[in-house]
């Protein structure tokens, strides 16, 4: 190779410019750490196609993929949180609300919709964990009560997907009151003979697990979901004992009778639809009959 060819030999040139890959194209599984194509993961309902790990899912996306596409109507969207106590810790509560609304694209931590599931009428709600850890404040409680009222008005079942760290500390006693408020609303639903399906997703903790999340006529856990009241370390320090591995996972809770079944997210529509048809004595051409087994 001549000196001139050496100068123009492109194989010796190393580009310093990085390949332009749009943000969000790839996602790493939080369990097996495989790099996944985001569009494929979304089509698979945020379940890893490699290891079946159920990743956290946006509340609105969950409801849109759970309910039938036609006839969905949002309930309680007009309710927005207010800083009544003028609460301030390291940051003003008012500022925390604004930041959470911007990052989550939701006005609070619960989204409620009325619609149909496999052509059967239903009201469904889902917690948005990215909004202050899915914490339950006065707006979450009020929206849940509206969901119960809508189910009673339409004489249909209620489904709730929980994903929460518990009561919202910035609302103090008002947030704790939501535990009683939501429980009382579910008692009204029960008196009407309408079923409540509680789906416990990762994580369901604190005041939400101690109230509405465990009051389902049928309590369903997603695979390996973290479900409990206090964290492992707090419990071990209190009881002064070592606790079994995975004692707050849905599989352990199913084994010990705390929940009724574990259902893969990709099968949730058919499973709940079948249970709804059976419990309300309705028929739908889209429902596959259930045998009642776990």
UniProtKB/Swiss-Prot annotation:
Gene3D superfamilies hit by this protein: 2-enoyl-CoA Hydratase, Chain A, domain 1
PROSITE patterns: COA_CT_NTER
GO cellular component term of the entry, any: acetate CoA-transferase complex
EC numbers for this chain: 2.1.3.15
Gene Ontology BP term (one): malonyl-CoA biosynthetic process
Record family assignment: Belongs to the AccD/PCCB family.
Identification of the protein by name: Acetyl-coenzyme A carboxylase carboxyl transferase subunit beta
Organism encoding this protein: Aliivibrio fischeri (strain ATCC 700601 / ES114)
Record gene name: accD
């Amino acid at each position: 190779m001549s000196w001139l060819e050496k100068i123009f030999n492109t194989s010796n040139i190393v580009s310093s410019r990085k390949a332009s890959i749009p943000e969000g194209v790839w996602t790493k599984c939080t369990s097996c750490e495989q790099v996944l194509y985001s569009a494929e993961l979304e089509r698979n309902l945020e379940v890893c196609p490699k290891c079946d790990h159920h990743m956290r899912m946006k509340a609105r996306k969950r409801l849109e993929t759970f309910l039938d596409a036609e006839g969905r109507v949002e309930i309680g969207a007009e309710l927005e949180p207010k800083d009544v106590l003028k609460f301030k810790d390291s940051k003003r509560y008012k500022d925390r609300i604004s930041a959470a609304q911007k990052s989550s694209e939701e006005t609070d931590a619960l989204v409620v919709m009325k619609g149909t599931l496999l052509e059967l009428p239903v009201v469904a709600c889902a917690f948005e964990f990215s909004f202050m850890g899915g914490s339950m404040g006065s707006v979450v409680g009020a929206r849940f009560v509206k969901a119960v009222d809508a189910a009673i008005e339409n004489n249909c079942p209620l489904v709730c997907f929980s994903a929460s760290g518990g009561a919202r500390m910035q609302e103090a006693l008002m947030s704790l009151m939501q535990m009683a408020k939501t429980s009382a609303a579910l008692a009204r639903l029960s008196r009407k003979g309408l079923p409540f399906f509680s789906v416990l997703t990762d994580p369901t903790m604190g005041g939400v697990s101690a109230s509405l999340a465990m009051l389902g006529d049928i309590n369903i856990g997603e695979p390996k979901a973290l479900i409990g009241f206090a964290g492992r370390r707090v419990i071990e320090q209190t009881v002064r004992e070592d606790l079994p591995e995975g004692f707050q996972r849905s599989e352990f809770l199913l084994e010990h009778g705390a929940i009724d079944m574990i259902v893969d997210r990709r099968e949730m529509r058919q499973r709940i639809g079948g249970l709804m048809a059976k419990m309300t004595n309705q028929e739908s051409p889209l429902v596959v009959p259930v045998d009642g087994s776990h």
